[in-house]
Amino acid sequence: MTDSRYLKRTIVKEEIESRYLGEKRTLRIYLPPGYNELLSYPVVYCQDGEEFFNFGRIATTANRIILDEGAEPFIIVGVQVDVSVRTQEYAPFGDRFKAYTACFAEEIIPYIEEKYPVRRSPQERILAGDSLGGSVSLHLALLYPDLFTRVISMSGAFYSASQEIYAAAEDLSWLSIWMIVGLQETAFAADTGTYDFVQLNRDTRDLLEKRGALVSYQEKDGNHQWGFWQNELPEALLYFLQER
């Protein structure tokens, strides 16, 4: 049974008008236990924001690791996506990719930093995503290394178009990425084809390491679904947020 302390959480909804996307985008913001506007906090930005809260149970997990497992209190920002245009926004070959990444870095980040006491160092901003959300998080770091240096990727959809972009980078020694993929993800049917996610993640790990990135990489029994990712979220968050 879940400890009742983990269920008492503060989540705020915001709406941002994006000129890049030409529409409004909903943000869901988690504030940690003991939240105080006079303090400052690390921040985790999640792609597929609604799913991270609803299926990943990230707010409950955050409470638990902050209250009982030594995580530094942190803020979470979940960025909503319309599933019907998710691939267009998250994949580098998508027709909304440039607009989405610009919105994320140039509109969402300044909006949050103006309204909430989040820290502004690249080491205090973490990008998190599953599947295509993992790959677009890595793209964001490469596009805006002055903003992002830390990435959580769960079963990243590192298609060849993404790998070619990553491979073009010469020095990634500034990047730290936590990666996991499920061993049962060898033939996952995505909207653009069927892919061996284990091989995609191994190849991406190798090319990142060759360019100097700090990579924490794991393969575990699991499928391409939230039941797997939810269980791995605590370790992913603690990797970057454990108070030392």
Regions from the language model: what does each represent?
Residues M1-R244:
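Non-catalytic cap/lid and distal C-terminal segments of serine-dependent acyl enzymes
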